[in-house]
Amino acid sequence: MEQNDFDAIQEAAMSEVEPYVPILQRTEGQPPPNAANGGLSYMSFDRNGDAGTAAAIETALQQIADGEGQAVIDKIESTPPGPIETKWGLGFRRYAECIEYIKDSNIKAPEGGVAIPLRYTIDEQPSYSIVSSNKLWQDPAREAQAKALRKDEKDSVRRSLYFPLVLRDARRIEEYYPDLSPSSPECMDKLGISLTHLESECENFYDAAEVERVYYPEMEKLLLEFFPDAKDALVFNHDVFDKEYEGDRTEDQDKKNPGVNANYANLVHNDLNDNSGRVRCRELLTRNLRNFGREQHYTEAEADAKMSRRFMSINLAKPMQTVRQNPFVLCAWPSFSDQSYITGYRVYDDRVGETTRFTYRPEHEWYWLPGQTPTEVSMLKCYDSVIDGSVSRWSFHSACVDPTAPTDAPCRKNIVVRSFVFF
């Protein structure tokens, strides 16, 4: 049989598989999310195999028409210059304004820490992002819809503000939580963040093939050693961040090449949530979908069995050189475990992904690694299947600008891998 014939048969077989629809689920003690459909996955609204994408776009357009997002922008822009009083606290339009407030208010940080502005959303509605590959953008008949959706997504930054916060040095976690080592699985269970060490043999992190061949196995070995009860670890993709990179940044999914990101995600968020943690795992196991790592070919029954036990999604961030600016910062689970999250929908042609945003709390417990070196790996949990409240479900994170760094400090250059760990 020719390879093309085999691929066609495999694709047809996949298309006949019933879509995986995650049941409604949330952490014990956590309030419902701010989400469409009462938190149900858009997979529940599948039409002829579209995985709910049409329903998601319809809801996005209706939300734009309702005007609540524009009302948030209007409120910000109609407020006189200076701090903006919100129900969460004082927010600031500009980073520099928030820095001045921090100085004037004499906000202090502990040793190894720093007081900084972090950008949070102040829009409590779910958000929608129609990815660039969605066929809507190429349909002339939907030009008006595309224009409205493009403007709404571009305006999302106008629905956020800077808020003052204090970062603690993650290396000093034991000072805040006695007997809790930052380099332990117990730290991940309690806080949703932890640290580890790696001396990688990967020489070129801009070479996607070398990263897959050398770095992915290193990361999987590290995860299995870090979590002694784990039975399997799968690294499934990665991102490279380097604002100053002068080579080819082009992404090529077919060649498992993520490209090189010039921008840092300067908004408090998490990559997954109750639904997408399970959906992403399932599509990797049964369809090998968007997988840059080891191929997976589980049957539905085998995936059911694997996912019936505990599994987690862990991101691991490692610098290529010591970080001087645009550090990666992490928030600990106990400080927001009773807080609703806001769902962000990413609409593809064949699925609707889900991420999360959070509104500000002064009590949010943030950590960083000042001067993070190339052998220091920061770990953050994006999803945990345990929902009884006994362990952290996830952390959230952001990039930020370090006000104490020299003006000529180089931007962060690092690699972030995404993984699932199975117990």
Give residue spans per PLM region.
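Non-heme Fe(II) oxygenase catalytic core, chiefly the N-lobe of the double-stranded beta-helix
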Residues: E2, E11-Q25, G29-N37, N48, ...
